[in-house]
UniProtKB/Swiss-Prot annotation:
UniProt-annotated location(s): Cytoplasm
Binding positions ([2Fe-2S] cluster): C3, C6, C18, C25
Assigned protein family: Belongs to the HCP family.
Record keywords, A-Z: 2Fe-2S, Cytoplasm, Iron, Iron-sulfur, Metal-binding, Oxidoreductase
Organism whose genome encodes this protein: Actinobacillus pleuropneumoniae serotype 7 (strain AP76)
Taxon lineage: Bacteria, Pseudomonadati, Pseudomonadota, Gammaproteobacteria, Pasteurellales
Gene: hcp
Reaction it catalyzes: A + NH4(+) + H2O = hydroxylamine + AH2 + H(+)
Name of the featured protein: Hydroxylamine reductase
Length: 551
C-alpha cells in the first residue's frame, strides 16, 4: 500500500504516506492497491478513447464511465474491494469495445502507450491485489526524485477532483465532448508517467483551466434543474418524527428522495455538503425537507450514531459506519461503497424509507436555531453593485473567502479563530464543508444590510466566488489580484486540490492554504509554488491577517 492523497495521511521521519495494512481513512491496503490497478486500467481506456476519436468514434458510455470510476478512488468514497474490481473489469470491457470499433476502420490498430494493452491477471481479489503492486504510485519515486514524483501526483489528484465534478455534472444531464477529450488527454498522458517537472506544472495548471469549464457546466446543471439559489434560513435543530439523513453532494439524489418520501410522514434532513440544497427553489419547496443535521463529515461516527433514522451517502465523505454501530441503517448509492453496507441502485430509496419507518425518529422538537444559506452565483453577482458601493463608502474594507474541506486536526480551529476575529467591516464568503468551523456563529451585517457571512454553497461553488470576483474586477476596472479579496483555503482531499489548481490557472495569487502542506509535495516544490503564485501556508490568524491586509 502507498497512498498519500489526503491531508490526514501519515507523515513520519521515515517517509510520508499510508503504507501499512490500513490507511488513516480506514481504507485497507488491499482496496488501496486495487484502486491503483483501476487507475492503470483507466489510463488505458482514456488512451484508446483518444485514438477512437481520430476516427470519429465516440463511446458515450465509456466517456461517462471513465471519470465516474476515477471518482471512486477519491478519499472517503469507496472502500469496497469488489466494487473497485468491478470498475477495473468494466474499464477493460469498454477499452476492448473501443479497440474493436477502431479495428473496423483501421485493421490491427496499434497504440504507443505503456498501458495500451494492460489485462487483468485473474478474477479473484487475491490475484488482482498481487497484480496491483506493479502499479503502485511510488514505483519510480527513488529514480525520478521527490519533486517530479510530487508534482505528478499533484496533477493526478487534481484530475481526480475534476473527474468528480464531471460526474456530478453528467448526473444532471450535462456533457461536453470537448471537455471529455481534454479529460482523456490528461488521463492518458499521466499513464505514461511523465518526468519533466516544467511540463508537469504546466499540465497541472491546464487541468485547473479545464476544471473551471467543468465547474461552469456543473453550475449550469444545478441551476437549470433546481433554480438559482436564493438566501434562505435553515433550521439546524431536530423536529419530532421519523427521519432520513442524506449526505454527500448529489442534489439529484436528494430530489428523488424528497419525491419518494412525500406524504409518508418522514422528515428529511441534509448533512455536510448537502446543506446548500435549502437555497434551491426546486428543493426547498418540499415541506418535509425540515433542516440540516450535524456538522463536518469527520464527526459523523458520533452524530450518525445519535441520529434516530436512516442515512444515505450519495458521494464523499464516508467513514467506517461500524464504529458507531449504525451500519444496518446507512445506505450508499452512486460510486460510494463500504463492505456489508446496502448499496442502492437506480434511485430506489424504498429500503431507506422502510428503515426510517422502523426507527424511532426524534421524540420531540427542539428549540429552533437558524442559519442562512443560498448566496449562489446569481445572488452574489446581483449584489456586486451594493458591494462596490459599500467599498467606496469605506464600510466594507475586505472580503475573505474562507472555505474548502473540513477535517480532524486540531489546527483546523485556525479557521474558526480567523473568521471570528476579522474586523466588523469585513465579510466572509464561505463554501464547502469547511464552513462548519464557523457557520453557526452570528456575524451580523454591514451597514444593516449585507450579511457578513455569505454561504456560497458546496466546494464546486468556488465557481460562484470566482464569478463574483470577475464581476467586481470588471466593474472596478482592476485586476483580480488588486481586489480587496483574499482566499484562505482548507484542504483535505482531491476536490480541494483541483479547486486550488483552478485558482492558480486563473492567475489568482497569494492564496493561503492549510492546515498543513500536502504530504506529497516537499519543501522545494512548495517554495516553487510560493515564488510563482504566492501560495502560502498558514501561521497564526493574527499574523496571516496582518500579511493579507498589508499587501
Amino acid at each position: 500500500m502507498y497512498c498519500v492523497q489526503c491531508e490526514q495521511t501519515m507523515v513520519t521521519p521515515m517517509g510520508n504516506g499510508c503504507s501499512f495494512g490500513q490507511g488513516m481513512c480506514g481504507k485497507t491496503a488491499e482496496t488501496s492497491d486495487l484502486q491503483d490497478l483501476l487507475i492503470a486500467c483507466l489510463h488505458s481506456l482514456s488512451a484508446w478513447a483518444l485514438k477512437a476519436r481520430e476516427h470519429g468514434i465516440i463511446n458515450h458510455d465509456a466517456d461517462n464511465f471513465a471519470p465516474r470510476a476515477f471518482f471512486a478512488t477519491l478519499t472517503n468514497v469507496n472502500f469496497d474491494s469488489n466494487r473497485i474490481v468491478g470498475y477495473a473489469q468494466q474499464a477493460i470491457i469498454y477499452r476492448n469495445e473501443l479497440i474493436k470499433a477502431i479495428s473496423e476502420v483501421e485493421p490491427n490498430p496499434e497504440l504507443n502507450h505503456p498501458l495500451a494493452y494492460i489485462e487483468l491477471k485473474g478474477i479473484s481479489i487475491d490475484q488482482l491485489a498481487e497484480q496491483a503492486k506493479e502499479f503502485a504510485l511510488d514505483t519510480d519515486r527513488a529514480e525520478i526524485g521527490e519533486e517530479v514524483h510530487g508534482v505528478r501526483l499533484l496533477a493526478l489528484y487534481g484530475l481526480k477532483g475534476a473527474a468528480a465534478y464531471l460526474e456530478h455534472a453528467y448526473v444532471l444531464g450535462k456533457f461536453d465532448n470537448d471537455l471529455y477529450v481534454e479529460y482523456h488527454g490528461f488521463m492518458a498522458w499521466l499513464g505514461t508517467k511523465p518526468r519533466d517537472l516544467n511540463e508537469l506544472l504546466e499540465k497541472s495548471l491546464a487541468i485547473g483551466s479545464m476544471n473551471f469549464k467543468v465547474m461552469a457546466m456543473l453550475d449550469a446543471g444545478e441551476t437549470e434543474t433546481f433554480g438559482n439559489p436564493v438566501p434562505a434560513t435553515v433550521n439546524i435543530r431536530p423536529v419530532k418524527g421519523k427521519c432520513i439523513l442524506i449526505s454527500g453532494h448529489d442534489l439529484k439524489d436528494l430530489k428523488e428522495l424528497l419525491e419518494q418520501t412525500e406524504g409518508k410522514g418522514i422528515n428529511v434532513y441534509t448533512h455536510g455538503e448537502m446543506l446548500p440544497a435549502h437555497g434551491y427553489p426546486e428543493l426547498k419547496k418540499y415541506k418535509h425537507l425540515v433542516g440540516n443535521y450535524g456538522s463536518g463529515w469527520q464527526n459523523q461516527q458520533k452524530e450518525f450514531a445519535r441520529f434516530p433514522g436512516a442515512i444515505v451517502m450519495t458521494s464523499n465523505c464516508l467513514i467506517d459506519p461500524n464504529v458507531g454501530d449504525y451500519a444496518d441503517r446507512i445506505f450508499t448509492c452512486n460510486i460510494v461503497g463500504w463492505p456489508g453496507v446496502v448499496h442502492l441502485e437506480k434511485h430506489n430509496f424504498a429500503p431507506v424509507i422502510e428503515k426510517a419507518l422502523e426507527c424511532d425518529g426524534f421524540p420531540y422538537t427542539e428549540l429552533e436555531h437558524y442559519i442562512t444559506v443560498g448566496f449562489g452565483r446569481k445572488t452574489l453577482i446581483d449584489a456586486s453593485d451594493a458591494v462596490i458601493d459599500l467599498v467606496k463608502a469605506g464600510k466594507l474594507s475586505h472580503v475573505f473567502v474562507i472555505g474548502g474541506c473540513d477535517g480532524d486536526k486540531e489546527e483546523r480551529h485556525y479557521y474558526t479563530d480567523l473568521a471570528y476575529a476579522l474586523p466588523k467591516d469585513t465579510a466572509v464568503l464561505t463554501l464547502g464543508c469547511g464552513k462548519y468551523r464557523f457557520n453557526k456563529l452570528d456575524f451580523g451585517t454591514i451597514d444593516g444590510g449585507l450579511p457578513r457571512l455569505l454561504d456560497a454553497g458546496q466546494c464546486n461553488d468556488t465557481y460562484s466566488a470566482i464569478m463574483l470576483a470577475v464581476t467586481l474586477s470588471q466593474k472596478l476596472g482592476i485586476g483580480l489580484n488588486e481586489l480587496p479579496l483574499s482566499i484562505v483555503l482548507s484542504w483535505f482531499e482531491q476536490k480541494a486540490i483541483i479547486v486550488l489548481l483552478t485558482l492558480l490557472a486563473l492567475g489568482v495569487k497569494n492564496v493561503y492554504s492549510g492546515p498543513s502542506k500536502p504530504a506529497f509535495l516537499n519543501d522545494n516544490v512548495m517554495n516553487l509554488l510560493h515564488e510563482k503564485f504566492g501560495l502560502s501556508g498558514l501561521t497564526t490568524p493574527e499574523q496571516d491577517f496582518g500579511h493579507i491586509i498589508n499587501k
